Amino acid sequence: MLKIADRQFSSRLLLGTGKYPSFEIQKEAVSASESEILTFAVRRMNIFEESQPNFLEQLDLSRYTLLPNTAGAKTAEEAVRIAKLAKASGLCDMIKVEVIGCDRSLLPDPVETLKASETLLEEGFIVLPYTSDDVVLARKLEELGVHAIMPGASPIGSGQGIINPLNLSFIIEQAKVPVIVDAGIGSPKDAAYAMELGADGVLLNTAVSGAKDPVQMAKAMKFAVEAGRLGYLAGRIPEKNYGIASSPEEGKLTI
């Protein structure tokens, strides 16, 4: 089970809800993923405009936990305002803190992320910050009291997969809160690898919404996350430079 604060989830796959070809495909992909946590950008939702289309209306919200995010924020103050807007609209008090420091790479601003996380913790939010794979920054966020750490595998939407597995493994090793690999996942292989490293979960969006068949890809990601987790728990064999026969020498037939 994935445990975030006082909540437990059977699925370790968190799914983003942006950029799907249609509401219908989005709904089918969400269902196929069997994800229980759905994230979305508050700024791109028509929360207070009932006349405008809203993907939340297409879903059975009793089945999902909503994870609003502060995408579009460039300062801690902006992120806090967006989080409060989400809470005021009756959405979940969990918030994914996302403060972008570079428009080209979409990498997070470490200083503003720390500031926003600290303020939102003081306001009583369940805080899940999107961060880089900086090991020290991850530790500082945990020391603040965040409820999960969400290091990026690579830049948002890049599909490059896990660029720095060593740093991710360091973050996972030191963390006492869930580590959810977020951003840059491009294929089921990437999702499985993140879980094999020991991550507690994977959050992805573009890998599914941008696939030729988002519904099938959502299903593939579900199985990849499950396989990676099982592989991690089972324990892989150590790598060696030379081959080792799988058949024992003892009792070998002499011909």
From Swiss-Prot:
Q: Which domain of life is it from?
A: Bacteria
Cellular component annotations (GO), alphabetically ordered? cytoplasm
Record keywords? Cytoplasm, Schiff base, Thiamine biosynthesis, Transferase
The Gene Ontology terms for molecular function here are: thiazole synthase activity
**Binding-site residues for 1-deoxy-D-xylulose 5-phosphate, renumbered to this chain:** 157, 183-184, 205-206
Q: Which InterPro entries match?
A: Aldolase_TIM, Thiazole_synthase_ThiG, ThiG
Leader sequence segment: none
Task: List localization entries.
Answer: Cytoplasm
Question: For this protein, what reaction is catalysed?
Answer: [ThiS sulfur-carrier protein]-C-terminal-Gly-aminoethanethioate + 2-iminoacetate + 1-deoxy-D-xylulose 5-phosphate = [ThiS sulfur-carrier protein]-C-terminal Gly-Gly + 2-[(2R,5Z)-2-carboxy-4-methylthiazol-5(2H)-ylidene]ethyl phosphate + 2 H2O + H(+)
The pathway where this protein functions is: Cofactor biosynthesis; thiamine diphosphate biosynthesis
Key word Transferase present: yes
Quick check: keyword Isomerase in the entry? Answer: no
Q: Which family does it belong to?
A: Belongs to the ThiG family.
> What is known about its subunit structure?
Homotetramer. Forms heterodimers with either ThiH or ThiS.
Q: What does this protein do?
A: Catalyzes the rearrangement of 1-deoxy-D-xylulose 5-phosphate (DXP) to produce the thiazole phosphate moiety of thiamine. Sulfur is provided by the thiocarboxylate moiety of the carrier protein ThiS. In vitro, sulfur can be provided by H(2)S.
**Protein name, as recorded:** Thiazole synthase
Give the organism, scientific name. Bacillus licheniformis (strain ATCC 14580 / DSM 13 / JCM 2505 / CCUG 7422 / NBRC 12200 / NCIMB 9375 / NCTC 10341 / NRRL NRS-1264 / Gibson 46)
